[in-house]
Structure formats: C-alpha cells, structure tokens
Amino acid sequence: GETNVDINLNPKGTGTLKSGTAAVKIAGKETIWVPAVAMYPTTTNGCADLAQTELTAGQPELKSLDFDASSDEFAQFAVAFPKSWNEGTVTFQAFFTANTTNTGTTSWKVAGVAIADDGAIDTGFGSAVGPTAKAMSGTANDLAVTAESGAITIAGSPAAGEEVFFNIFRDVSADDLSADAKLLGIKLFFTTDAANDA
C-alpha cells in the first residue's frame, strides 16, 4: 500500500482538533518570551546594565535594561529557534515601564541575523522594524505593552539549526518620552511549519 500519506482534518468554525479529549497542537504562530535578564548591552552605544528595582517590599520587583531619552541605545540577545520554525519573518511586542508620570511615547526596534555552523558571527544585521511608538499611561511604573511589530526579515539566509542574533534599540527620533524607558522583555513571535522538531 501507499506510504507517507498526509491526513487532512478540518475543524468546523471555532472547533478544535482533538485526539480523544486532548487538543492537538497545530503548526503555526508560536511565542518565545525573552526577558531583559537574557539580554546584554552592546559595547558601543549600549543601554545601562541590568538593574533590579524594588517598588514595594514583598511585591514584584523589576529586572530591566534602561534606555536613555537623549540618544539611541542598544542591547542584544540570541535565540536558537526550534527545528520546526519555517525560517521566515518574525515579529515582536515590547514590555517596558518608566518611573515617571510623563505620557510620552517610546519606540522600540529589532533587527536580526542568522549564523550557521562554521559561519562568520561578525555579520551585519538585517533592517530594524518596530511597532508604533507606545505612550505611557501617566502613572509611574505602570506596565506598557506595544502593539505587535511589522515583519522582521532576518539577514543571513536562515536555516534549521542556526543561531539568530537580535539587536534591539530605543529609536529616540521616533518617540518623546523624556525619561529612561525600562525594558522588561519582549514577546517574540515566529511561525512553525512542522508538527514537532523530529
């Protein structure tokens, strides 16, 4: 008989594909949380080093990278995506705060480059992309979450098994918050096209 045959199942409406009573995971959009503690300031024009801030004893403390209002500052991080990643574009949302009652906006942008085994790490990033600048609420230390960015094309011809380096920065030419923006982390969205990483 035939081998390697696909099975196509199409849930109706808002129905969920299940095996017995358990939902079956379907390839598609996925999320990675990258906290500020997994990032590092760049040597040139870097943001401030990782800081910990207590707001009230016994309540959530902040681990943040602080970005000035006066000039563009940068940080980096890296991700080895799962094999099921489709090697396509990615998007992100930034999570941040500021110790100010200012209602100004903050603009975050991200660029990436994929490096293969035996490839040169000393390689330029692709074009930086970011969401619309996000305004603060006017209450000090409120959480601010940006909209999802546009598609970020990763330089370096991404392929399975590569490491992707990312460069994130505050674009002060596109914002007007007159205080440090405290980056807490980002949600990084990517797309899978396989059921697992086998």
Give the ranges of each region predicted by the language model:
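N-terminal leader/pro-regions and domain N-caps
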Residues: 22-70
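Short beta-strands within extracellular/lumenal beta-sheet-rich domains
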Residues: 68-84, 89
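A short beta-strand element within beta-rich, extracytoplasmic domains
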Residues: 88-98, 106, 186
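Short coil-to-beta strand junction motifs in C2/discoidin
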Residues: 102-110, 180-183
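Extracellular carbohydrate recognition and processing domains
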Residues: 120-157
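Proprotein-processing/basic-patch segments
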Residues: 169-198
